Amino acid sequence: MATSKKAPTAVETRWWRGTWGRRFGVAFVLTCLWSVPLLTVNAWIGAHAYSLGNAHATSTPFTGAKSWLSGARTTTPTFSFTVPDARQSYVDPMFKAYYSASGGAQALGSAITPAVPTRDGWLQFFTYGALLLPKAGATINLAPSSGGLYAAGLRDDKTNVIRLPLGEALLASGSASPVGGDTSTLTYADLRVASRPNTLVTNPVTVSAANQQGAQSNVFIYEGQSSAGAVGHLVPMDIWSYITSADTSPDGWQTDFGNPMSEAIPATSSRQGTVHHLLVQVFWRGIVVEDRGLTDSDGDPLITRLNTGADYLRTFGPPAISVTSQTPLWALGDSPVLTTPDTGSPLVHIGQNFPLTAKGDVSWTKSGLWYHVQWKTRGSHGEGWTPALATTFTAPPAGSPAWAGFDALSPDLASYLNSQGGNTSAVVYDVTRGQYYTYNASGQFIMASSAKVPIMLTFLTMTEAQGREPNDNEMYLLTTMIENSDNDSAQALFDEIGGAPAMSNFLSSVGVNGIAPDPDGWGYSTTTPLAMVQLLTMLHKGKVLNAQDRALAFNLMENIEPDQQTGVGDTAPNGATVAMKDGWVPGPDNLWAMNSSGIVTVGSETYIIAVYTQHENELQDGWNITDHVCGAVGQLLA
């Protein structure tokens, strides 16, 4: 991350609660370390040092410090954990507000696990730490001296979310995990030794002006007094600029990092045959690594927080998961449900907000956590395993649609669609249950006469804006365009609305993307089946047109001449009300494009469907496909 490189310019004299139960005043001393060893020049920046009372011991000036700092045990990482691709990870909805408001991208990085239910609450791990949403009544020990998972955690009063840096737990355990890369010469056990109180340094002494060439600046953070004088730690200016940047520490460096617990410790790490020189420094709420072999966008050495999230999981293993059978959960994005975790065969493909039910058992694999789940739709049900990282136990907002592949509705229908390849696409919206089923939903297809629907809606929106109803001639054009699919009538109305630009403006105004009107021929406009379903959904839900014009549009689409009905119209269940429009035309390649779209209502059940085909040798081939898909959906959803 790029940060501005600046010296501290303000005196901060707020009280700070120390890790050993004493209040330390924080004083900053800017020092210049010259090329002569141990010779420095001090420049106090108007700071005030607050008294520490009786803390004067010379070797370990702060007795009662974290007892684990003097420990000798080490912990060898045994859990195999692979960090997922950031594109496949999601910040759980329960943490999104905190993550956005608290600079989560900088302070925490990407999610590397899902938010999982534990004994104490919901826990999600990130690149640089973790977030905890405690259960009511849970006892959470945030004291830095605890050396546990929650040590040095920072609670947000607005959301009750606790940010966990994890570094304290890794230091306390003496994790043998390498710091700053798999081949690093430094481990957390080494950092623990470097963080002991006897590593505090005295305030650097003054040297003559003759040694003032080629200085490198440091900031001295005062911790207290010993018999040798003021003691604390030196922070290199590059690291100081990083931790004090508003991007890195939106709540201020004292809150987001706290005082240093060590000096900046040199290390090396080999990457792709190149030796990288590192500086690692421990703070109360984070560990910072400067890699002098990499640069940021300003060309300066790259500085980041340490990847404590993955290091914690590899050292301690995953947290104990507490999932109750029959607990509802929802998909966060596209993911499969497999027969077995990791390597199983896909059973269904689910998408955002798709509802699932936990079976109660879980499985940790190298790729992460998997939940055993079951699903049920109008046409299918089953059980399998889904990656927990792509799920949430937080219900989506009311009215949010759910998404899935056709295999979640009917494996047989999904298999049929797959056999048609990329020249076929289908989208169904089960309005009654708020569920989309899709196959090749974003493919672009020639609209043919289905373009007459957006022409009609654009025209009626225009007359509404003009404060009038269609005149007799316009009503004739509308009727023959929709009911008889008359192309001359469609051309007349297309010209009257202003052609392709006007239709594009209408579609943009109602938020429908994916339909591209063709200025040279409306019939060769293109659409995605999803866009067509979304446009029909807006008509069905009254999001376009006033009530009178909406009734007119439905009346026209419900009275299509029999010779213009196939697909939706030919296969609708008995007693269904169908508002529809089909289309077919030879494409530029002289192969047929054919489609069928409509709104079908049977009693209390309503679904909206669009099936598009193209590059078919015979028109009958397109008819057969639309009949098969529309008929199968009608049997499943009506």
Residue ranges and their predicted role:
Residues 321-324, 372-401:
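Boundary regions of SH3-family modules and the immediately adjacent low-complexity/disordered segments
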Residues 34-335, 360-365, 381-388:
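Extended, compositionally biased repeat/scaffold regions that form elongated interaction surfaces
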Residues 461-479, 499-501, 547:
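Short, well-structured active-site flanking segments
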Residues 399-433, 437, 492-638:
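Penicillin-recognizing serine hydrolase domain
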Residues 434, 444-468, 481, 609:
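Active-site SXXK
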Residues 339-355:
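SH3/SH3-like (including bacterial SH3b) beta-barrel domains
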Residues 10-32:
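N-terminal Sec-pathway targeting helices
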Residues 366-372:
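Short aromatic-glycine-enriched beta-strand elements
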